[in-house]
Structure formats: C-alpha cells, structure tokens
C-alpha cells in the first residue's frame, strides 16, 4: 500500500485575519459604551463616518492597483483602523476631519506601502497625528462628561454639530464646552497640565469638579476601564500577547510615579496617567498591532517600555496633552533595531564575528 505524504504546513490555524480583527472590534465595545454614556453619540457617529471613508478609500486604491476587492475588504483591517481613529478624536469634530485622517491612514500609511502587513507605521496613529498637527484646536475640543455639561446635546444636536458646526438650537462648540461651573472643559490630562502651568497646585486641581470623587477624571477613568476589560478579553482569547501591554503600563506607571514623587507640584499624578487619555486603548489595541510592533518576546517588552517612557515624556514636557500616538510612531521607527538585537539564538550556527 502506498502512502502519500502531504506537503507542509502540517498544522492549520483556523483563525484567519478577518476573525482576529473581528474579535478586536468586539473587544472595543465596553470602551465605546463608556464613551457613549459619558460623552454622548459623537464618537459612534465618528466611527461610522470613518468606516465609510476607510472602505471607500481602500476599495479605490485596490481598484487602481488591480487587486481583488472582496477578499481584502473582508479582512476587517480597514474597519479597525477607522474605529481606532473614530474613538480617538473629539466626539463633535467636523465630519471632514475624521474623513481626512482616515483617508490619509488608509492610502498613505497603509496602501502606499503595499497593503496589510507591509506598513511600517500604525495607520490609525498616522492619521491621528496628521489631524493633531493640522488642526490642533479642533483636536483638543472635547465635551465635558455627563454631569458637568452645561448643555447636553441630543442625538440630533450631535449630528448637526458634526455636519453643520452648530446644534439645532444654534449652540456652537465653544458654548457646549463650557461646563456647569462656567469653566471651559478639556481632557483631564490637558486640564491638569494647563492648571499647573497657570500656577495652581495639584491639590487645588484635584479638588475641582472634574476630579471630584474619582481617580482620573469623571468619565475618562471608566472609558479606560472599558478598554482595559476589552484588553483582558483579547488576552483571554489569545488575540494578543501580554508582553507589550504589561510592559507599557508598567513603564508608564514607573516613570509617572518617579516623576510625581520628585516633582508633585508640576507633574500629573500616576493614576491620571494610567486612567486618562488613551492609555488603555493604546496599551491593548494600538501598541499591540502585530504588523508594526516588535516580533520577538524580548523585543516586545522593550517596545512596550519605550512607548511608556515616550508617552510619559511627551505628556509631561511636550506640547500635546496625550503623547501616545507620537510615542507609538517613534517606537515603530525603532522596531527593526529592536528586532535585530533581540533575535533568539539559532543553535547549530556559529555566531558571526
């Protein structure tokens, strides 16, 4: 009896790219739900606009490159890029901003390099940085959370604000940003940094309504908890490995604690660093991008530490309130060097001189 030996590979991984991307999309739901509860419908609408822009941009480039449309569009990578960008920008940013950022992310940062798996930089963060540099005022115009809003926009008001720059009653973004205390609101990180530079003490800032009874700003801490829960889901389902999120969070916590102990009157507290801004979103959904992150276990640890350090430095001494996007892109640049020096030893080969 003759036996036929099948060719390799001899194992089959049932997890396709589209399935992994779908699980990541599902994992973002707790964080998005917290955003919706505290900040309204804005970010959900931004995600929908970004998704349409991403699919159209990807389809257009694939058509120009004469690549198969259906197979590529079904891998869900464009939708994930759109979602990450949609939840990262202010909820009432004009529709054309998220469209510009998404189109730039898909065409320039992804397809220009050959598509999924070829891009050296995280596409969503490239799109975000383009928007931050080009439209700094709009990209720092966040609504106060529920409970601190002087005017709470409805779903119809949110749509009108995004597409027409005013609510149905004629309120502008500047009016919506003013909280119940009559003070224009910002993210906890931005609010804290601005207050410190204005001469207020950390104790005075922490006593303000934004931080009343919470560890990192009303609303924002629960948004981060939501993305943390989603990250645990990704770890449990083995969609990501633990090295990058753990080393990133540990690094950020270490440097934030060290800086705060040395200069408590001029630097943000460690808990605000950990549970404000895009910390947990970055730790589990952005920094863990398998295409642009390090590929070795030691390299992943170094990569996470580097992002944590850069995030703390930019947040503490830079001109932007949340430096995560810049930190991730700078770490992306270092990935080839990190991988080169952290490759495991190959036995049976003499080490080159």
Swiss-Prot record:
It holds the Pfam family NQR2_RnfD_RnfE. The keyword Membrane applies. Its cofactor is FMN. It comes from the Bacteria. GO terms for cellular component: plasma membrane. It is found in: Cell inner membrane. The complex is composed of six subunits: RnfA, RnfB, RnfC, RnfD, RnfE and RnfG. This is Ion-translocating oxidoreductase complex subunit D.
């Amino acid at each position: 009896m003759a036996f036929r030996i099948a060719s390799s590979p001899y194992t089959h991984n049932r997890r396709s790219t589209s399935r992994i991307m779908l699980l990541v999309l599902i994992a973002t739901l707790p964080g998005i739900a917290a955003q919706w509860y505290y900040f309204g419908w804005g970010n959900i609408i931004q995600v929908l606009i970004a998704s349409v822009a991403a699919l159209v941009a990807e389809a257009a480039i694939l058509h120009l490159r004469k690549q198969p449309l259906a197979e590529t569009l079904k891998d869900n990578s464009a939708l994930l890029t759109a979602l990450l960008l949609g939840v990262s920008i202010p909820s009432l940013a004009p529709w054309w901003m998220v469209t510009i950022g998404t189109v730039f992310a898909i065409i320039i940062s992804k397809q220009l390099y050959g598509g999924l798996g070829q891009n050296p930089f995280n596409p969503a963060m490239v799109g975000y940085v383009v928007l931050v540099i080009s439209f700094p005022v709009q990209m720092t115009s966040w609504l106060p959370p529920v409970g601190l809003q002087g005017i709470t926009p409805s779903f119809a008001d949110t749509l009108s604000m995004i597409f027409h720059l005013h609510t149905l009653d004629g309120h502008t973004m500047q009016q919506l940003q003013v909280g119940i205390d009559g003070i224009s609101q910002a993210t906890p990180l931005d609010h804290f940094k601005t207050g410190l530079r204005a001469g207020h003490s950390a104790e005075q800032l922490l006593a303000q309504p934004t931080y009343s009874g919470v560890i990192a700003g009303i609303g924002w801490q629960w948004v981060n908890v939501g993305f943390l829960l989603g990250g645990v889901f990704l770890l449990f389902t083995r969609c990501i490995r633990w090295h990058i999120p753990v080393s990133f969070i540990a690094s950020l916590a270490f440097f934030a604690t060290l800086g705060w102990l040395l200069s408590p009157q001029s630097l943000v507290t460690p808990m605000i660093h950990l549970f404000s801004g895009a910390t947990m979103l970055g730790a589990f959904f952005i920094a863990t991008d398998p295409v642009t992150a390090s590929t070795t276990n030691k390299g992943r640890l170094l990569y996470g530490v580097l992002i944590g350090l850069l995030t703390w430095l930019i947040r503490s001494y830079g001109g932007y309130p949340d430096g995560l996007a810049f930190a991730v892109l700078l770490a992306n640049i270092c990935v080839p060097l990190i991988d080169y020096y952290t490759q495991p030893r190959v036995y049976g080969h003499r080490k080159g001189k």
